[in-house]
Amino acid sequence: QVEVSFEQEDGEREAVLMYPEYYESYDEIGPAHIFELNLTGEGFRARQCFKEGVILLNAYDEIFPQACVEESAEVLIPMAWNRLYAACGLSPEARAAYETYVREQSGKVLTILLKKRELKPLHFFFEKGYGRKEQIEDAVAIASHEEWMEGVASLIAWKRQLFAEPEKTADVKSRYSFEEF
């Protein structure tokens, strides 16, 4: 596998693409010595997404549905996450496909993000709605167990910000209204 990162001059990632591995094999057919080429893995198709030295992001995104059939979550999670997090040239259809996959694999994605100990991607994960309230609570426990206090503090703040329960002030006001007097 190869991960390629395209960065702006300020160091901000513009796009990150995962090129999975692939295998080539030849089968010999009978006494005629005819060889058949077999390709396994989406890495070959991903490497064909170039034209005159320029990457074709739409072509790269089009391989994802087939990759979901052939590749493991170990390959697919970085492919989907990287395209969402650094979404240069991402079409609405491709975004929807990647988001669906990230939501389906949200527990594994969260585990990967917690291991990296990077706050920006973790915040993006919850801010965009890929993670649920229960997951942020679990993430706080994991970060605490790993003694990552900056992560714990940030996760607690995001939980309050993103998953705040509605205040019951309207109910309290109606019970203690003094307008009747």
Segments predicted by a language model, with ranges:
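Generic marker of "main functional regions" within proteins
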Residues: R45-C49, H123, Q135, A153, ...
